[in-house]
Amino acid sequence: VGGWVPSGQALTRQGASTGEDIYISGTLGEAAAALTLGLDCQQQLTLLEGELFHRLARPEPRVDLGIVLRTLATAAIDISDGLLADLGHVLAASGQLGASITAEALPLSPAACKLLGKEAALSHALTGGDDFELCFTAPPERRLAVATLARSSGLTLTCIGTVTPGGGVTVSQGGAPHVAVESGYRHHWQADG
């Protein structure tokens, strides 16, 4: 997807600040769940499998949402490498910030929960890529505006956590730290760290 942005209005990865809310659009982990299940177009798929495969084969980039977010969000990224990896890119670009994420706040895919179980669906939501939903940050005083945008657009926009000082992403589940096995896709050319 390509296009033009008015001068000075590009929404970039940098710009998040400590104390801001972290949001995601839609549900996460469906494309990764389709891969885990080995779904492809040659199979006769159930309704739930079809939902997952559609998200893998025909993702819908949130271009219109991104345009509107230029006036609300301070930083944004599409979730192509996995939530933890892509949020990490935003935090690094914004000055080595951190994040506190609540696992229970993540809108999990009902189809992935049903076919893989809730823990696997959570793992895919945190680390699976190719969803092309948006992850963005916004100051707490813009919560009402984000909620209004969600209602008017018909999209699910969920606050999943907060930007914190210091590096790293902490995910808590039931008040205790949740350990993710991996952080998401790492491009072969990326440096460690």
Predicted regions and their residues:
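Residue-level recognition of short, solvent-exposed, well-ordered loop/turn junctions
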Residues: 17-18, 64, 127
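Phosphate-handling active-site elements
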Residues: 7-12, 43-46, 96-100
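Glycine-/charge-enriched secondary-structure boundary and capping motifs
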Residues: 1-5, 71-72, 76-193
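Short, glycine/charged-enriched secondary-structure capping and boundary segments
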Residues: 13-14, 37-39, 90-91, 150-151
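Short, compositionally biased
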Residues: 32-50
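Polyanion-binding loop/helix "lid" in catalytic or ligand-binding cores
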Residues: 47-89
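Glycine-rich anion-binding loops of enzyme active sites
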Residues: 1-36, 162
